[in-house]
Amino acid sequence: MGDVTPELQASFIRAATWHGPLEEAESMLGAHPGLAVASIHTAAILGDADGVRRFLAEDPSAATATAPPYGGDPLVHLCLSRYLRLDRSRTPGFVAAATALLDAGADPNGGFWTTGTYPERETALYGAAGVAHHPELTRLLLERG
């Protein structure tokens, strides 16, 4: 990961997904350009299909690898990405990255449990349909799941 520590990656995942502050994620990318290509998780969050495919070519099991802070896999992180929701110009990259992950064995029904008073299961489908309101990615997950 070069100058990208596991803690920095976890902070980026927190900022770039779900309800995270995207400005913070952008600041981290500016300060640490290697973060964008540090892992399959960061590539997925950014909709970098070529990057996702490179990680899968090196290690196909990366499709199901989990990462802090939530314990999500790359597909779940992709579907909860703030970039997916806020930048529709990245749609082709996100759909291609999701397809590559699914082809490599990612679980279209996968997710993670939140912690707190009322734990909930956050899934890829919830991210695509309920958070990003992304019909193409939602359809892909339903077809595969």
Residue ranges and their predicted role:
Residues 72, 83-100, 104:
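Ligand-binding grooves and catalytic loops that recognize ribose/phosphate and carbohydrate rings
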Residues 42, 46-55:
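Hydrophobic repeat-domain scaffold segments
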Residues 2-16, 34-45, 64-88, 110-130:
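Ankyrin-repeat boundary/"N-cap" motif
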Residues 20, 47, 82, 93, ...:
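Ankyrin-repeat intra-repeat helix-capping/turn positions
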Residues 25-34, 54-62, 95-108, 139-145:
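Ankyrin repeat domain, specifically the short helix-to-loop turn at the C-terminus of the second helix
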Residues 125-128, 135-145:
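Short, intrinsically disordered, charge-balanced linker/junction segments flanking boundaries
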Residues 17-30, 112:
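Repeat-mediated protein-protein interaction surfaces in helical alpha-solenoids
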